[in-house]
């Protein structure tokens, strides 16, 4: 393991009897994939430290890309996990992402309605806009801009793989540091991917308001936002 076994305890944002929300670090896959190297590290390796007295560790209620940071929801037991899976599948969970892009969209706010499909390219795959793809909708607004960069708030209304990354790239504003859909100059390679799951609203109860959780942006994003004149609460 590349981290201490209990390092996620310091990244715990929310805890109750049904779920946990953690601040996922960038650069660590949430689970081992089919193309993962044997023995490669992933976030699930550290869930045992998050039992908090439960007989089994929590499990993923949804996923974030390896290079995305921020709010990640875990179910603490099978019944809770089923409920969370339904909420995500039905689009009931409201997700807000922050992105810093290389390039500024022509329209400073809007809705991107562009279907997406996974395409095999050579030895790998990527997601592309395709007429016969799955429906994918993202709303966005530019919060700040300067030096050829834009600070964008994006809200996916659907949950397709790489959705925000592909949608913003389609506007001529790929996410800074995106290793797959970005314009990776030598300078860009110095940055981790600037996509952060900033806030999540989860309507767990029918009688109470949704649970709101926010994750602080990583230091590299804060540094760029400061250059753009953005103050973080």
Which residues does each PLM region occupy?
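Loop/turn elements at beta-strand to alpha-helix junctions within RNA-recognition modules
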Residues: 78, 157-158
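Pseudouridine synthases involved in rRNA/tRNA modification
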Residues: 1-18, 28, 157, 165-233
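RNA pseudouridine synthases
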Residues: 1-126, 130-137, 144-145, 216-232
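Short histidine-centered loop motifs in beta-beta connectors
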Residues: 147-155
